[in-house]
């Protein structure tokens, strides 16, 4: 049986520096995720760090995206090999790794997604990702079809951005603007000039190493500015944000 994920089109688009417009999925519900998958985004983040997701909620969301052109990207709760292994086995191919601060941490993230000898991923012969053992070339194809995006969101990460971006197997550098702002002493103010200057610096250093850069930017003016600065994979909003804004607007229309 063929696996319809290989080759990984999202990974190829990033490598080709094609602009990829995404959205954040935080509602942790297969219905809302399915709606996002119909909207036409290039990629969707299913959030395991700040949203109430786990293996049991991720699986129905992946099922809901079956046939969607939107590539599912999972943000793991932490850079931990066992967690990453379990997410690989249920069918994720694109990973967003939070709080990467050193080259060694970036290397660990890459190794966690690769079978030996390239990495340390544990081997199961039957799981959801290989259609329960029916994809004949899964082992041969898996290593080269996994996407690793690492988040820079601390001063140490900024200091080591060149080494992180140069790490083999890292496909892109993603800026976490809120945590970065906090780390730079501007909690709750990612628009501060110091934060914006640092974001642009990260984009530039990623580009210098031939790696695409990305960011979450729910404000349109911010998203367009980051695209002008060279970011190529930008999440332009979230299901939670859209839902919150739309319901408040609807209520205000009739209640005020």
UniProtKB/Swiss-Prot annotation:
Catalytic residues? Answer: 50
Molecular-function annotations in GO:
2-dehydro-3-deoxyglucarate aldolase activity; magnesium ion binding
Residues the record annotates as the site (Increases basicity of active site His) are 89
What are the recorded Gene Ontology BP terms?
D-glucarate catabolic process; galactarate catabolic process
- Residues the record lists as binding Mg(2+): 153, 179
Which reaction is recorded as catalysed by this protein? 5-dehydro-4-deoxy-D-glucarate = 2-hydroxy-3-oxopropanoate + pyruvate; 2-dehydro-3-deoxy-D-glucarate = 2-hydroxy-3-oxopropanoate + pyruvate
Asked if the Swiss-Prot or TrEMBL record annotates the protein with the keyword Kinase, the reply is: no
EC class of the enzyme, as a word:
lyase
Tell me how the cofactor is bound: Binds 1 Mg(2+) ion per subunit.
Q: What is its EC number?
A: 4.1.2.20
Sorted alphabetically, the Gene Ontology cellular component annotations on this record are: cytoplasm
- Site feature location: Transition state stabilizer: 75
**Pfam families xref list:** HpcH_HpaI
Please list the cofactors this protein needs. Answer: Mg(2+)
> Which Gene3D superfamilies does the record cross-reference, listed alphabetically?
Phosphoenolpyruvate-binding domains
- Annotated substrate binding lies at 151, 178-179
Cross-referenced InterPro entries, in alphabetical order? Aldolase/citrate-lyase_domain (IPR005000), GarL (IPR017648), HpcH-HpaI_aldolase (IPR050251), Pyrv/PenolPyrv_kinase-like_dom (IPR015813), Pyrv_kinase-like_dom_sf (IPR040442)
What is the documented function of this protein? Answer: Catalyzes the reversible retro-aldol cleavage of both 5-keto-4-deoxy-D-glucarate and 2-keto-3-deoxy-D-glucarate to pyruvate and tartronic semialdehyde.
Q: How does it assemble?
A: Homohexamer; trimer of dimers.
Entry's family note: Belongs to the HpcH/HpaI aldolase family. KDGluc aldolase subfamily.
Q: What is this protein called?
A: 5-keto-4-deoxy-D-glucarate aldolase
